[in-house]
Amino acid sequence: MEKFRVYGQSTLSGDVQISGAKNAALPILFATILAEEPVKLTNVPELKDVDTTFEILRKLGVVVERTDEQTVLIDASRIDRYVAPYELVKTMRASIWALAPLLTRFREGQVSLPGGCTIGARPVDMHISGLEKMGAAIELDEGYVKATVNGRLTGTRIYMDKVSVGATLSLIMAATLAEGVTTIENAAREPEIVDTADFLNKMGAKISGAGTDTISIEGVSRLAGCEHSIVPDRIETGTFLIAAAISGGRITCHNTKADTLDAVIEKLREAGMQVDVTENTITLDSLGQRPKAVNIRTMPHPGFPTDMQAQFTLLNVVAEGTSKITETIFENRFMHVPELIRMGAKGEIEGNTAIIHGVESLSGAQVMATDLRASISLVLAGCIASGETVVDRIYHIDRGYEHIEDKLRGLGARIERFSE
């Protein structure tokens, strides 16, 4: 199993190119199932989850070709299988996004109940109930979600009991080829939903309201091909801004959008960091100062993103003062805290809240990654700790961070990948 060895006490400074957003690339890749003509996607990150999505698409009969590091050509015109199999789906919860496009285009689809990060229940119930409201017949059989419909799905009003990015995306995809108008109320508002809707509209969909809590989709009879560039990864951007903040450095992130990170930037400034933005860059200068502790409460967009919680936990670990971090989106998302305590952090977990008491320094240790965002916080902790840190189970990182050790080395980190 591969691990990272990180040698600490590094100041991370320099320039870094931000990759395309994993959380936009995955739904857009699954949405290509809807297209009857070839699609060209650019700014597609090289990630384990993206590769898994390619394999699922190929199992369905989709032709997928990566022509260079950033460009992918996809032809879904000859899909002849409608099952996303367990051996692929088990590693990635996003696989559920195959169901809605298969169902609305081909009247049937089967997806194995998905896997992925172990951070709470993350049920697929909202995906299923929404599809049922549109006329689908759903059954759970031998670990598979099986969906069928006689004729086209039917547009309807769907109120989401809970804000869900995954279910919002599923229902948008389903509604594109449904008969009539579908209205999704209490919809998620994330930038990746806006990007997916922009992609679908380029193919001929009629979606309005993406980025608000009410999305309207007027069904069309077919979707064509198009070209589309994946939006920059706001979570990767935030991660590198944290890297500068905790190490006393100065980092400029290129190919990014500050307007997708308002809550994160506000908290970084509250922590005493200097943050400057242009149209396509964000620069954080720590001014060589230790950050101040900041309270965090994760919320659906435009609130503070849950995918930045672990990184801000690390910031608070080495900050001046005591902070309270409240996680409202997922269960079990403080599994990085005991690992940071092994490195000298001070804090305790009370239900969905972590109380962190800032310390001046950390010490290297052997730690274990438990999910994608927790794992990157442990790597960054290793960059600033004294001595050597070994991070186990780094396959989590490869699911969501493109060429992470190369990018960190470019900023001054001493990090190597090895196998045991």
From Swiss-Prot:
Its EC number is 2.5.1.7. Belongs to the EPSP synthase family. MurA subfamily. One of its GO terms (biological process) is regulation of cell shape. Cell wall formation. Adds enolpyruvyl to UDP-N-acetylglucosamine. The keyword Cell wall biogenesis/degradation applies. GO terms for cellular component: cytoplasm. Gene3D superfamilies: Enolpyruvate transferase domain. Pathway: Cell wall biogenesis; peptidoglycan biosynthesis. Pfam families: EPSP_synthase. The modification 2-(S-cysteinyl)pyruvic acid O-phosphothioketal is found at C117. The active site is at C117. This is UDP-N-acetylglucosamine 1-carboxyvinyltransferase. Phosphoenolpyruvate binds at K22, N23. It comes from Actinobacillus succinogenes (strain ATCC 55618 / DSM 22257 / CCUG 43843 / 130Z). It catalyses: phosphoenolpyruvate + UDP-N-acetyl-alpha-D-glucosamine = UDP-N-acetyl-3-O-(1-carboxyvinyl)-alpha-D-glucosamine + phosphate. UDP-N-acetyl-alpha-D-glucosamine binds at R93, K162, V163, S164, V165, D307, I329. InterPro entries: Enolpyruvate_Tfrase_dom, Enolpyruvate_Tfrase_sf, MurA_subfamily, RNA3'P_cycl/enolpyr_Trfase_a/b, UDP_GlcNAc_COvinyl_MurA.
